[in-house]
Amino acid sequence: MTKLWGGRFTKTAEAWVDEFGASIGFDQQLVEEDIEGSLAHVTMLEKSGILANEEVEQIKKGLHILLEKAKKGELNYSVANEDIHLNIEKLLIDEIGPVGGKLHTGRSRNDQVATDMHLYLRKQTKEILQLVKNVQAALVEQAKQHVETLIPGYTHLQRAQPISFAHHLLAYFWMLERDYGRYEDSLKRLNVSPLGAGALAGTTFPIDREYTAELLGFDGIYENSLDAVSDRDFIVEFLSASSLLMTHLSRLCEELILWSSQEFQFVEMDDAFATGSSIMPQKKNPDMAELIRGKTGRVYGSLFSLLTVLKGLPLAYNKDMQEDKEGMFDAVKTVKGSLAIFAGMIQTMKVKEETMTKAVHQDFSNATELADYLATKGMPFREAHEVVGKLVLLCIQKGIYLLDLPLSDYKAASDLFDEDIYDVLQPKTVVARRTSAGGTGFTEVKKAIAKAEKILAN
């Protein structure tokens, strides 16, 4: 098959070479964006007096026919035509005749593909923003039900201090809020039009770049044609934001996996988000949480891959940049799928309050409260820390917990202890007293929920 760019060549490549160089197998996902960009471009060509009205109407009609076929999955692509851009141009010429070849006037595939990807990522980013909000809403709904449900807080995966389960869930709300902000902020740099930059140096045709930018809903245009066609920062930024988002999802998935184990029994995943074993009838595996944890690495890989591609490229376009798309497409699919699954898991998980409550009563996570108690009575905190450490050791030797220790043992350790110590050591009291801003105290958690709901409502 003769290439649309084949004028200066004396022979064509063999099929296996075409196969290696072609991107149509994956960039066909840009078909709607490609046609959308072409419709804006040809509209501008008429406005600028470059093409006649009758030519433009023919081209528009053909493009709309192709768009409808694309939506129905009825377009037949050819590897010989390499990519989505040449495939659409060839299909357009087949549909309306030689006038279809005028569509590419004043445009290069270099600015065309960049435009397609800007349009694609803008749409996907906006959809991801909504999915992030869905997960945040699920976290808040669970938090509202568990303000006074206590759970051990951990450091080094060792029980540290009792906290409100709602407080733990809300930690992820705020992580996701930062993720939301990163995606939202990236739109400022993403929503800029490269269309009209040509191959690298602009064009001699009297095009109107601002007009096509307006038609496509962009906020402005790239100020430098070289930058316009060689920039992939917007994809890197998307992948970076996505990597952080997936990190946050993965961390909570790790906790859900632990919490749903027999060793913890803090939560139970809904059957819809778990699987069984082909050999062990008793098993209920948290597969969806494990998959999100595992898929996080795919997104990291896409980010590192693109950074590696870009780091040594001279300006402007290089064929290496064809490698920007598969990772982008994969990351979009992974992030959207993970967010949808995650929201469902959080909405439907069963919280085992009794097990959580038992856990905070059978540990030493209230020990810090003892040290604070002594410090408020004038003992230097470092000395109080030493006293309480010895009391914990005494309890371990006796096989009891701090609430079980007789007052006589407390008095022997320090005269500052009194009978009110047993009130102070109650896990619910320990949590309620953490009233510093952003703390786990019930009043603070309720404030945090109210603030989170206000954010979701805006």
Swiss-Prot record:
Entry-linked Pfam families: ASL_C2, Lyase_1
CDD domains: Argininosuccinate_lyase (cd01359)
Location, primary (coarse class): cytoplasm
InterPro entries recorded: Arg_succ_lyase_C (IPR029419), Argininosuccinate_lyase (IPR009049), Fumarase/histidase_N (IPR024083), Fumarate_lyase_CS (IPR020557), Fumarate_lyase_fam (IPR000362), Fumarate_lyase_N (IPR022761), L-Aspartase-like (IPR008948)
GO biological process: arginine biosynthetic process via ornithine; L-arginine biosynthetic process
A single cellular component GO annotation: cytosol
Name recorded for this polypeptide: Argininosuccinate lyase
Lineage: Bacteria, Bacillati, Bacillota, Bacilli, Bacillales
Entry's family note: Belongs to the lyase 1 family. Argininosuccinate lyase subfamily.
Reaction catalyzed: 2-(N(omega)-L-arginino)succinate = fumarate + L-arginine
Locations listed in the record: Cytoplasm
NCBIfam families per UniProt: argH
Biological pathway: Amino-acid biosynthesis; L-arginine biosynthesis; L-arginine from L-ornithine and carbamoyl phosphate: step 3/3
E.C. number: 4.3.2.1
GO molecular function: argininosuccinate lyase activity
Keywords: Amino-acid biosynthesis, Arginine biosynthesis, Cytoplasm, Lyase
